[in-house]
Amino acid sequence: MTIGIHEEQQLWRNGARIVAGVDEVGRGCWAGPVVAAAVSFPTHLLNDPVALAGINDSKTLSAEARQAMAQQIRHLASGIGLGVVSAHLIDLFGIAEATKWAMMHAVLSLPSLPDGLVIDWVKLPELPLLQRSLPKGDAISISVAAASIIAKVYRDNLMHEYDQRDPRYGWAAHKGYGTAQHQRALAAHGPSGLHRRSFKPLAAFVD
């Protein structure tokens, strides 16, 4: 299935007026927060294939293309919400719960609460809204793809800020993922306050 608005249309048919796409980034990282975004577009824009051309799963775009597309999304969206959950809370409550909290906070941070949600993978039963949860939603739904771009750009920028504060770990390069560079930094310096010490790969570096 190519990316489009099929999922949004399903929610419209079920009575939703405002539909937001929701996605997260950073779930599999060894360090840093998990970040979620919720994005809603005016209905007339969702029905205009030209207006939202180029929006796609953030993983398919270069860093430069994501930054440019994030600017376009901010200009066109009727609402954008963000949710950020720290490594400390991830360690306390687990990545699954942390991801849900980030997504719920993103939805509740929207300027207008939507009637329906298209969510990548996760279900949010705590929110009494119409929902469609689907695998690889960021490759299917324009709204979810937009959320994936906003979340990715926000988190990448945050990791760049962390890198400026403490360049020892190379946050700007690997964004907290378990690359060889990251593993070498962990071996040399040990875990930082940004590391998810509950994650199994960190066990070798935690006293």
Curated annotation (Swiss-Prot):
Subcellular location: Cytoplasm
Top-level lineage group: Bacteria
Amino acids binding a divalent metal cation: 23-24, 120
Pfam families the UniProt entry points to: RNase_HII
Record protein name field: Ribonuclease HII
Catalytic activity: Endonucleolytic cleavage to 5'-phosphomonoester
Top-level EC class as recorded in UniProt: hydrolase
Protein family according to the UniProt entry: Belongs to the RNase HII family.
Gene name of this polypeptide: rnhB
InterPro entries (alphabetical): RNase_HII, RNase_HII/HIII, RNase_HII/HIII_dom, RNaseH-like_sf, RNaseH_sf
Cofactor note text: Manganese or magnesium. Binds 1 divalent metal ion per monomer in the absence of substrate. May bind a second metal ion after substrate binding.
Main function: Endonuclease that specifically degrades the RNA of RNA-DNA hybrids.
One of the record's GO cellular component terms: ribonuclease H2 complex
PROSITE patterns in UniProt: RNASE_H_2 (PS51975)
Taxonomy of the source species: Bacteria, Bacillati, Chloroflexota, Chloroflexia, Herpetosiphonales
CDD domains the UniProt entry points to: RNase_HII_bacteria_HII_like
Location of the RNase H type-2 domain: 17-207
